[in-house]
Every structure is written in structure tokens, then in C-alpha cells.
Amino acid sequence: MIDVNKFESMQIGLASSDKIRSWSYGEVKKPETINYRTLKPERDGLFDERIFGPTKDWECACGKYKRIRYKGIVCDRCGVEVTRSKVRRERMGHIELAAPVTHIWYFKGIPSRMGLVLDMSPRALEEVIYFASYVVIDPGDTALEKKQLMTEREYREKLDEYGNKFNAKMGAEAIKELLQDVDLEGEVAELKENLKSAQGQKRTRAIRRLDILDAFRKSGNRPDWMVMDAIPVIPPDLRPMVQLEGGRFATSDLNDLYRRVINRNNRLKRLLDLMAPNIIVQNEKRMLQEAVDALIDNGRRGRPVTGPGNRPLKSLSHMLKGKQGRFRQNLLGKRVDYSGRSVIDVGPTLKFYQCGLPREMALELFKPFVMHELVKRDMASNIKNAKRKIDRQDDDVWDVLEDVIKERPVLLNRAPTLHRLGIQAFEPILVDGKSIRLHPLACEAYNADFDGDQMAIHVPLSDEAQAEARMLMLAAHHILAPKDGKPIVTPSQDVVLGNYYLTLEQKNRLGEGMIFKDTNEVLMAYQTGHVHLHSRIGLSVADMANRPFTDDQRHKIMVTSVGKVMFNEIMPADFPYLNEPTTDNLMNGVPDKYFIDNGEDIHDYLAGAPVILPFKKGFLSDIIAQVFKVYKVQRTSDLLDDMKTLGYVQATHAGLTVGVADVPQLPEKQEIVDDAHKKVTTISKQFRRGLITDEERHARVIEIWNDAKDDIQQRLTDSFDPTNPISMMSDSGARGNISNFTQLAGMRGLMAAPNGGMMEVPVTSNFREGLSVMEMFMSTHGARKGMTDTALKTADSGYLTRRLVDVAQDVIIREEDCGTDRGLLIHSLREGNEMIEPLYDRLVGRCPMKTIVNPTTGEVMVAKNQLMDEQLAQAVVDAGVEEVTIRSVFTCNTKHGVCKKCYGRNMANGEEVEVGEAVGTVAAQSIGEPGTQLTMRNFHTGGVAGGEDITQGLPRIQEIFEARNPKAIATITEVTGEVIAVEENPAEHTREITVQGETDTRSYSVPYTSNIIVSEGDMIHRGEKITGGSVDPKQLIKVRDVLSTENYLLHEVQKVYRMQGIEIGDKHVEVMVRQMLRKVRVMDPGDTEILPGTLMDISEFTDRNHDTLISGGVPATCRPVLLGITKASLETNSFLSAASFQETTRVLTDASIRGKSDPLLGLKENVIIGKIVPAGTGMAKYRHMEPKTVGAVSENVYSISDIEAQMKQEETKE
């Protein structure tokens, strides 16, 4: 076996007929498969043991030689080599064809490769190949032209006229001769000469031909290899035949396709031997050609060959294509051993790094380790007995299992894995029952709930895998989300409710105004029932030595509540005491207003002091973020567990219930509804009189009902009692929002119609009153629309993620610093008056390109290339700096990746990014994962109109990343200057806008309907919009430069996500956008060898120009090209990655003609060939490290391979 980790690249090319014969172990001459009586393979058939190897290990076909000692002997009776039966998966055969046939990929693809080489149209080729016309191969000294087509009749006439002075043939033989005659060097030289003068279509065609001929010339492939004299037969175990019960056989479709080829081939041989008439032979040759076409790519030409039940047979090409093809099914996604799946259940008592593993499942997963341990402890005499013991589930097995799983992390994965937090490592704890227990706080990252979700579990086997699982993947380390650096592990539901209830304050509860010496006293008083949880009390802070109080505060009494004292007990000892849910308290400690002097009457203070709000979900998240920033992973993980326990306990004590009486009724509701009805009647009258159009009427009716609903909603909010259980749930962020209440207590409002609009008749009832039958029916439309939209958009979003991952998977942090001198000027993003992304958000975790100085004092605030954390970024913003030039992924010079300085901080852990981080994949996941949230927004409003509908969301994101023309396209100016006129042109139904620049003046004609956003006298810059809508980035890149286009795309993507309230770090979008703009099209090749019109990587282009300039030549010129992500993925340098993405056959056809070599730089291509991925710990710099031995060598840790070897040994002894 070759060691995949040894080779550097992988090349693909065309196979000549001689090459095919050299691969083969023998010729398949008969179409037979296996004998129906003996079930043994037939001689010379498709399963012949002489060609492909024995069906049983170390045994020839006739049974003369059995056992391993005859290894390598070829049996003199049956001719079968004695070897492992595994060779039937690797040995190929071949079929010698009686007539050459063309390979359908090269004749049929677009553009037809054969057509380009021969300069013939695909239609002409088809006529020749399928025996409809003759083609002139050598006109001799006749008036005929080479490659001229003739019908049968014309051919006979010319024969009569010229005799055998010329040579014309039909079929693949003719094409083969023509291809052999092609003089590559001559044709290339001639085409290059022609290109200098050619224009239009002729030029395009010449460039295409030149491209393909040059590819043949450089790759060493010969054009006539596109025609085959022999075809390979793939190993029999890759096209198996298995017996079903009832004596029938199931076989791979390939066997049927091969059988047809062999049958026709043998018939053709016989006809040729019999000297049959030409017309019969031609027909048989045509049928052979069709049979080979069907074998290679069934259905590419004409009707596909069908099997039983009219099902098209799966050919060799189909085996590679699509989700079920070889690439995506078997190479990129394999099923693995040591894995299982089960339903998940909540494990509220678990620590954050633990998961509950059902006993039976653990026993099966860790079986080899338990077996080894049993033998080691002398509890079983050998591996076999140990296995028996486990199968019987003896009592002493469980103790061994307990010991074996200690310190061995397992991986839990929930599908769909939308981002990298969909797989995390946990330490297993054995539990009873059959369900996996999951920590409640890990649900957010997995998007899991316990309504029947299932999860898969995997066991990392090797020491390295275990170390990586523990160091890099342990759930306790994944507190921040990679997309925005905010905590993803935030308490929700019960935990939020419990902590909200705990920190609630109420006036005049038991023990109000008591003053305590320290926290222990407070807790004792609470436990003995002297004080209520929500009572406001005084507490001396003198004993809290570690907490950051001011000296002045230490001598005073702090006013707080019993619950808050309990809450602060779980916080780190030197963390500020939390008394109010504000950032000020979180960062700087308790404000002075909560302190009273010794001797001051606390009751007087409490009488005038307002009740402080309890801690809601958002504040809990801020606490976690702050603790993570200061104390890092371990302490945060402990805090989360404590917060969880506290929350559950308090939620239980609170005993919150919801009854129908908790849904308040709004007395003035009826009045509001009646009022709206009156307004609608007025509008209808106006419409009937013809004063307004139907569209206006519809819009106004919708507006009236939405206003009525908003009015009811506002009054409901005002009338809610803060201790109402429903309002507590909503206010704390545990469950539900105002829209749910409006539907419960107010009115449901307008419903979505199936056509995507709104129904004019609202549902005026609420759920408490109950809906009428008519209202119920109307509600079902919206609910169904919500469900179907969700289902459709989830698929869309998943496909978007797949394309994003594919285009960016090879972007990895490759070096420390690329040394670029360019940067990106950034400022806050605004849309009109609305803030989309503040400057602070864009600065955190980035490095400035130049030193940042305070504009007023002139002092240096941030040095060049210094990573900005939250404090520095805030300081820069506070100093009044409005724009900063930062290092950006856009301007990074690193080839095939990004450098540390241009990328900045790794958002998932708040540290500077490390070399080897797969930032491309993380970026793709960060953009794709919220895509599903964008889509699922519909789901929760139950189809109520006015709920956020995200039609602009996902489709707009796809439009941007696929570089499609926007729906509402804006007109942009090509010159910088003044708008001198905006005139109407009634004849054309347009308006003319004239912009006068410094050197030239441009006029733009826009339709009447478009919204013009400039007026006379305005100064505008080139690339700016004159009408409303979205700019087409392909126009922008022509008018402005690449950086402006990149910036525009970044702005647009951020706009869509931020409007939805979803935060994504700029750098993720930058990574994706850079991948769309990394190609250039060569305009003038200068003295380089590049062909005009070639699409190539910027880095490769600059390298070629660099070499040309050094040798004193004229450099090539190019222009940047914006590619959509699908196109960019297919244009990658790796043919393996492209082929496994889409259009597999087209990619492989092209790659083989060019003799492409895959440099194996990305992740995908390495996964395909089974090499370790070149990211993270798989990078060369980490792989070639020599481990140092510290201290004595410990006892060797056993591995799976040791145990398997031991089992095999015991089997062979028997």
C-alpha cells in the first residue's frame, strides 16, 4: 500500500490503450458472470478468478492449493494465483475492442473537446461517429477537402469519380486517424498568429481551440487517446453480485452494461471473420459505440439504457456524481466504527464537561478496551473468553468498564452540524436507561432540545485523537461562538427564570430593612425563615475583602436583596458585587447610590428608593462574557454549572404556574376594534367612489388593522403586573415575547395569505376568548405557510452553507505576517440614519495598519500591528476617532490563505489566531449557520402577519454571494463630478440625469418609475448610486477598484444580517468575499506564455509577470473578475475539490486533458485521498515536531490495533 501521507500532489491524465492493457490482469472474453449451478465464476467471464484473483483467501479455484503456505503459487490446473481475496477489489481486466470507439466525455461535453481539437462541429462529429456520414481523411489530389462530410450516396459517386485516389471513412476509426494527424505544435503556432488579427466570434473560437491544443501539448496527452481500442473492466468486488434469499441474484448495473459491450464486441468480431456485408458491420460497430457510451455515461446521448421496470442503469459516471456518488458518499463522508446513536435526554446534574452514556452502549463502544483490561487483570484467560464475558454481561464487567472510560473523552454530534460547535467532546459518565444525557447548557450550541432529538457518539481511539478531543474539543472550552465572539453558552428557559426570580426585589416583604454583618448571616436568616428571598436588606461589605469596593464604601452599609446575596455567592471572589443589571456595575463595581452611612435609617432610604430590576437573560450573558474575559475557560465553566444549579433550584422553589386567570382581559379592546371597523368602512366607500385605487385601499386597510393591533399591544404592556407569571417569563427572556401575549390577551391580527400577501379580514379574537370557525380557518393559512417556508428555506440555507464551505475550505492561517503595505479604511456602517454596525464592533480583535493617535492630545493610543482588545477599541471610539485603517483579509498578501496580523483575533477564544487555524471553514459556517435562523423566523409567529418575514434575507444573501444581477438594480455614475441636470423625457417615458466630470460628461437614462436619489447641484463620486436599489457589483468593479467592490459586498451582507438582529464578525464576510475576487482575466499576454482570456489566480499572475520582468520582457495585463461562490469553487486549483462539489464529469474531463496536478493544499482534497488535513495540528510545522521524553518512559498504552492483532493471533492458533 502507498502511504498517503508521503506524497505531495496527485495528477490525472488520459489513459492510452497500451496503458489500459498494462493495468489489466487478463482479457474478459465472455459475457458470463457465474455458473448458475456451482455459483463459481465462469472462465474468461466478468468474474473470472484467473484474471481477478481467488474468491476465497489463500485458495485456488479448483481447491488443489489451500492455506497460506502456498502463497504466490499459480495453480497448474485452474490457473488461479493463491493470494488474499482482497485483490478482487484492486485487479482490473480489459476488453479488446474489435473496432475503436470514442470516449463520450470528450465528444459530448460542452464545449466538445474533440470538436475543438479537430475544428469540427459537434453535429458533424456525431454523424461520423454514429455512421451517418463519411469524413474525408486524405483528399489526395482530388477536389475534395480534408474533414469534408459526405453521405453514403455522395461517397459512392466520388468513388466512381476518383476511384481510390482519396481516403474517406466513418466511425471512430476515422476520428482516430484525424486526431493522429493533428500537428499540435504547428496548429498552436498558427492559432497564435491568427489571434493577432482575429475579432469577435472568430477570436473567441480561436482562443478556445488554442487553450485545448496547448493543454494537450503541455500535458503530454495525445489527442488520439480520446479514442479507445481497449476498455478497462473494473475489479469485480466493486461491481458485486450477491445471492438473495429465494435463489435470485442482485447485481450491480455495471455488469449489465459490461455484458452488452462484450456481447456486441464478440458479435462484431464474428461478423468481421465472416467477411459480412459492410452495412451489417457498420450497424454492429455503431451498436458497440453506443454500448460503450452507456457504460461510461448512460443517458448522456439519446435515451438511457434501462433495466427491469424501466429504470435507467447506473453507469461509471453516475457512480461518481451527486450526493450518493463515490466522492460525497464514500470519500468525504464515511461511516465509522466505534460509534452509536440514541435519543438525548436532559442531564441537569452533570458538570459542563460531562455527558451521560448508557451502560449497554458504553460496553459495546469500549469493548476492545474492556477485553484487554479483563485479560490484564487476570479476570479472563484470553481475549476470546473476555469477549464471551462481555457478551454475557457478567457483573464484574461493569466495574472494569467504569475504570476504562475514565479520562477518555467521547465526541457527541447532532445533525445538522451547522457550525463547528455541532461536534464537541465530553467525559462520559455511565447512566442507566438507554438515552444519552446532555448538559442543558450545551443545547444552545447544538440547537438541541429534548423532544425526541437524537445524537451520535464517536470514540476517539489513538492517543493523539484523545489529546485533541480533550484539549481542543472539550465542551467546557467552547463558551464563545466563533461567529461573533459572544458567549453561545447562555442560560435559557428554567435557568433564566430561576435567576430572575432569585434577583427580584419587592417592597414590604418579610425582614425588609434588616441589617447583616456578613453573607453567612444573611443565608442563615433566610434558611431559618426570618427574611424573604425578595426582601431588601442592608449588608456590611467590610468582610468582603476581595471584592473591588472603594475605601469609602467599605465603611458603609450596602442596600441589596437576599436573592442577590445568594446570586453573588457563585461569582468569583474578586469579581465586582452585582447589585443592578447594568454594564457600569459589571465593569466598575456597585455605584455609590446603593450605600448608606452607618447610623442612617435604612427604612427611610428604602421608602424613597425605587425597586431595582432583576437580572434578565441578556445580563446573564454579559456576566458570562465578562467572567470569560477575566478568568478564562475553567472558572467560566464552573460559574455556568453553579448558575445552572442555582437557576433550577430557584425555579423549582418559585413554582411558577400559568392559568387562564393569568391572561388579563383588556376592557377597551372592543372599542379599538369597532373604531378600526369604522375606518375600514370609510376607506371602502372612498374606493367605491373611485377616489382611491384598489392597491391604495388594500394598503390602508392593512395599515388600519396593524395600528389597531399595536395600540392593543401597547395598552396590554402598560397594564401588565410585573409579578404576573406570564410577564415574568417574557420579561426574563425565559420564554415567549410580547407578540405571544398580544395573541393570548389582545387580538391575533392580520394573517398571511397563501400567495404571500395579507388577508384584509383580521382575526379580532384572541386565544383567551377563543376563535370563531371562520377565524380558525383563516389562521390555518398562515400556520401552513410558516411550516412550508421553514422546510424550503432550511434546505436553501443548508445548500448555501455547502457552497460557502466549498469556496473557502482552503483558506488557512499560513504565516505570522505577510508584510503587506495596504489596509482597509473603516468607519461605522450606516443605512440612512440607522446604525448598522458601530465602529467599536469593527475594531475589536483587529490590528491597525498605522499607529492610531488621539486627535485632540496627539498621544499614541494603539501601535501599528497591535491587536486591539475591547478596552483599546472603546478608548479609540471615545477619543472621537471616526475612521481607522486596519489590517484586513482583503489586503493580505499570503498565498492560499491569510496571515495572523491581517486576520486578527480568533473569535472563538478571544486570543490572537494561531497558524493552522482553518479560518475559511469557520467563516463559511459562521455565515451559513444563522442562515437557518433567517429562514426559521417565520416559524415562531405561527404565521401572524407583521411577524418578521425574511424574504429579503436569504435570497438577498444568495444574490450577493452568487454575484447575480440584483432584482432592483441601481444606476451608478461612472464619473466623479456634479449633477448638472435631471430632465424628463416624456416620449421615452424616462428621465435623463447628466453628470459633469472633470474631463467628460455622462448622461444616464432611467425609467420614470425608478426612485432618483440625487438632485441638481449634488457632487457625486464615481461608483455612487443615482437611483435607489442595489448596485450590481460587476458594474462597480469596472467603475471603481477591487477594494471598493469588496467593501460594498461586506457592507451589503452585514446589512442583511444586522437587520435581522444577527451579529457576524466582519472578518468572516471578508474571507468569503476575498475568495470571490481572487481571479483575474488576462487581457494582453505581453511576453508571457499565458493565453489571452485565461482565468487565473492573482498570485500566479503576479509570479508569472515577475519572472517575465526579470528576464526583460513585457508583462501581461489583466482585469479583476468577480465570481459567484459556485463558479469560484469550480475554478479552484484542486480538481479533486471541484469534482466533489458539482459538475463532476465536466471537471474531470477538463482536468484529465490538461494533465492537471492537484497540489493538495485545501482540506477537502486531503480528506478525499485519506491524508491528514493541512490545518490545525495537521500542519507540517506541527506534524514534524519531535516529542521530548520527560522522565521515565511509562508503560506502553495499548491501542486498538494491538487488541485486533491479538484476536487474529488467537483465531489462527485454533
Swiss-Prot record:
Residues recorded as binding Zn(2+) 1, renumbered to this chain, are 60, 62, 75, 78
Keyword Transferase attached:
yes
- Pfam hit, one: RNA_pol_Rpb1_5
Looking at the record's lineage, which domain of life comes first?
A: Bacteria
User: What EC numbers are recorded for this enzyme?
Assistant: 2.7.7.6
Sorted alphabetically, the Gene Ontology BP terms of this entry are: DNA-templated transcription
Q: Which GO terms describe its molecular function?
A: DNA binding; DNA-directed RNA polymerase activity; magnesium ion binding; zinc ion binding
Cofactor remark from the record: Binds 1 Mg(2+) ion per subunit. Binds 2 Zn(2+) ions per subunit.
**Reaction catalysis annotation:** RNA(n) + a ribonucleoside 5'-triphosphate = RNA(n+1) + diphosphate
**Key words of the record:** DNA-directed RNA polymerase, Magnesium, Metal-binding, Nucleotidyltransferase, Transcription, Transferase, Zinc
Family annotation (SMART domains): RPOLA_N
Q: What's any one GO cellular component for it? A: DNA-directed RNA polymerase complex
State what this protein does. DNA-dependent RNA polymerase catalyzes the transcription of DNA into RNA using the four ribonucleoside triphosphates as substrates.
What is stated as this protein's family in its record? Belongs to the RNA polymerase beta' chain family.
This one is known as DNA-directed RNA polymerase subunit beta'
